[in-house]
Amino acid sequence: MSVHAATNPINKHVVLIDNYDSFTWNVYEYLCQEGAKVSVYRNDAITVPEIAALNPDTLLISPGPGHPKTDSGISRDCIRYFTGKIPVFGICMGQQCMFDVFGGEVAYAGEIVHGKTSPISHDNCGIFKNVPQGIAVTRYHSLAGTESSLPSCLKVTASTENGIIMGVRHKKYTVEGVQFHPESILTEEGHLMIRNILNVSGGTWEENKSSPSNSILDRIYARRKIDVNEQSKIPGFTFQDLQSNYDLGLAPPLQDFYTVLSSSHKRAVVLAEVKRASPSKGPICLKAVAAEQALKYAEAGASAISVLTEPHWFHGSLQDLVNVRKILDLKFPPKERPCVLRKEFIFSKYQILEARLAGADTVLLIVKMLSQPLLKELYSYSKDLNMEPLVEVNSKEELQRALEIGAKVVGVNNRDLHSFNVDLNTTSNLVESIPKDVLLIALSGITTRDDAEKYKKEGVHGFLVGEALMKSTDVKKFIHELCE
């Protein structure tokens, strides 16, 4: 049997609180194999001041039986004391303790799992940095933090396919937990996750910022290049196959994106987005049925339906777009349906032709991730397929690049795709630089009527809204408020 040995040992002092669980030994072993010095204490055999006197670099709360309120000993007090001082990580009950400490509810998870593996999706940060999507993780639990009681200071970082929370992280402090067992031999990439724990330092995430070269956009782009390359090799899905299908007339009729948006009599147009999750927010509505959501938007007066088709971080698919187009064709006359936008990280003609065949009227081109020659090539190719793209920018320089290629519909993303921080002034600062014949759409961060009203007064033509609409209890009212 091979033993894992770290190539570059991480010399950290870890205090491991044992909640009377046999898996504590596995956690200890994994930490030691990465080079850490580990001190283990039962949850009733040491005090918080005594732990503080040890001056640990990292605190780790182990798995354990029972409920965090009654069976975790000093674990919750440790989380309260060390939050903001050093990194605090929790496994299984350790995560449940975090949920409880910050005001959440730990309850029956809806299923009892013992030694079973489940694939998860995650946000690629913290413990999940550089961990592939869809890995199998080992679960031993019947309790979990409930999504409805998620504390405002925490964000969901990982979940199962049926929506059970598998990871949470404090938005400010280096406090993070997972419901599964990274130290189990059945968990994929467990050693990498333990190593990621040891690589975190200090009391805040601000102190652990990733360099731009490892930004979220870079990771998504790299993953999508792999995905597209693999799919384009499958018989029946090659570029030549797609081209043959297009030449046979299999692409459905389309509407002119620019004409639909510019001919609206509303004060502003709404591009309503089908969005199950995001890297910044984690799961939003994993059980959403794309066609149902799109129909709600269309009946409420949306001018376009944006369909996220990226599978790893946003939990979308091209089939979602196909289904959205089908339901719109069934429920609306050809000239009265909303346009369909493929919201994707596009870098190749393959993705554009794929979108056209699936029923998209337009595609998103992100200036930030494309060289100027490639941007121009993809824009021209889209036009050859009779699609006017939505060209996304985030700065005055990117806006100039978009205008140079002749873009007629420009979206200003208020979210920086490297850091994923939102600044609603990003759109406002570019309004005066937009030519009169170019439509300006504000993207990201629009959550209230006041946000929309400010933009309308500045001359913004419309808004792309995703998360706020996905969470809205009255989609029709919300869209009406945005438009009028």
Swiss-Prot record:
InterPro entries: Aldolase_TIM (IPR013785), Anth_synth/Amidotransfase (IPR050472), Class_I_gatase-like (IPR029062), GATASE (IPR017926), Indole-3-glycerol_P_synth_dom (IPR013798), Indole-3-GlycerolPSynthase_CS (IPR001468), RibuloseP-bd_barrel (IPR011060), TrpG/PapA_dom (IPR006221)
Induction: By tryptophan starvation.
Gene Ontology CC: anthranilate synthase complex; cytoplasm
Known EC number: 4.1.3.27, 4.1.1.48
BP GO terms, sorted: glutamine metabolic process; L-tryptophan biosynthetic process
Record-annotated active site: 92, 181, 183
Stretches the record annotates as Indole-3-glycerol phosphate synthase: 215-484
Chain positions with Phosphoserine modification: 2
Keyword annotations: Amino-acid biosynthesis, Aromatic amino acid biosynthesis, Glutamine amidotransferase, Lyase, Multifunctional enzyme, Phosphoprotein, Tryptophan biosynthesis
Listed GO MF terms: anthranilate synthase activity; indole-3-glycerol-phosphate synthase activity
Glutamine amidotransferase type-1 domain: residues covered: 13-207
Catalyzed reaction equations: chorismate + L-glutamine = anthranilate + pyruvate + L-glutamate + H(+); 1-(2-carboxyphenylamino)-1-deoxy-D-ribulose 5-phosphate + H(+) = (1S,2R)-1-C-(indol-3-yl)glycerol 3-phosphate + CO2 + H2O
Pathway assigned in UniProt: Amino-acid biosynthesis; L-tryptophan biosynthesis; L-tryptophan from chorismate: step 1/5; Amino-acid biosynthesis; L-tryptophan biosynthesis; L-tryptophan from chorismate: step 4/5
One Pfam family from the record: IGPS
Leftover remarks: Component I catalyzes the formation of anthranilate using ammonia rather than glutamine, whereas component II provides glutamine amidotransferase activity.
Self-association and partners: Tetramer of two components I and two components II.
Protein name: Multifunctional tryptophan biosynthesis protein
Organism: Saccharomyces cerevisiae (strain ATCC 204508 / S288c)
Lineage, top ranks: Eukaryota, Fungi, Dikarya, Ascomycota, Saccharomycotina
